[in-house]
Amino acid sequence: MEGDRHTPPAAASVSKVLDDDDLLVEILLHVGFPTTLVGAALVCKRWLGHASEPAFLRRFRELHPPRLLGFYIDDRYCDSAPPTFVRMLPQPAELSAIVRRTNFSPYRRLSPGMLDCRNGSVFVTLHTDKSALGVHRPLCHGGGLTVLPSLPRPQLPLGSSCSFRQVLSKEGDGLSYYYLYVESSNRESRMHVYMMQDGSWRRHHLLDIGQLPRPRSTPKAVLVGNKIYMAAGPSGILVLDLTTSGFSTVQLPQGVEHGSRGTTMLSRAGDASGVYLIHVKVFQLCIWLRKGGNWLPVDSICLHDMCANLSKSDSTIKDWHTVLLMDQVVDYGGFVFLQMGGCVLHLDIRCRTLRKVYEYRSTRYRDIHPFMMIWPPIFPALKYDPASNLKKKDTRKLMDCTCVVKLRRE
């Protein structure tokens, strides 16, 4: 009987929220993470409608930009060991269960090797065939490991070899996969562009690069909208427009060259409006945004004092006079990973803070693969609408959200 006395106030609170669209939207805006938003949207179709509305998602992203959850690194003594996942600390308690799903222990027998991370999807090669490709989606319920068909192997003419290859992906009406393969000889270069269609790789384009500068294997290429940006030559970028099948070239800002490994990096703009260029020379890190046909200066940071202070406070960091950009593909999010000696450093560009996040176990310094919170959220379809008969756990979820909004306002 005592429980009945508490039912009317709770029911009245729930009813008040369900009858007020503006209040409900305000609560959903403050759930904190896209994965939590998906859970809240499962309550009923009405909640799902609000949570999946484009204008709402734009506001949600402004309040909660995609978060760096950690990174994968292929730091292993033998090819049979799975990639290592390193969490970025601290992490909110709500994300603990999700981050636990990032490891590859269940797939150890397949000896996965890292290729890339993109918006919550992890691309790996599989030991059964180094051309076989697997996709792991830790942030999706029941994501598991999806095995894609083996990567194509073009038949090369005598005297030609593969000088560049990379798997790329993009979101749209589903997830699209592209595979770039450049064959080169002393006289010419050709680019094979494959696209995953109906469960198989199909050639999308076969293009002569001609007299254009050849793509470089580092820094890695990025796909922005329908254009692929590839570092090429000593100081250029080769741009492939997938819509027109045409190439164009872009020169780096004056005085900037790709140089040796760890000098430049390309990064996608989060809204797919352009591409960022990040350049390190000695201790100077500079950032530009390519937009409207011009390079726009974004930021410039002197790393000397930060590196010196970090070396003094941590005796494990050696050779602090050499700072390199780690080859990484990620949407520009105000951070970058650097390599100094045998350590991985995380530079928060906005806060101007530098910290060590990993120390290599082997002397083979592999690439790093940042793992970001998924965006936009993937909402499942609801087969029925329980809005008129909410379960107790849904009521508790609503009350928790209401408390979060109240506390943040105070």
What are these regions (language model features)?
Residues 1-410:
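N-terminal entry/capping and adjacent linker segments that precede and initiate structured domains
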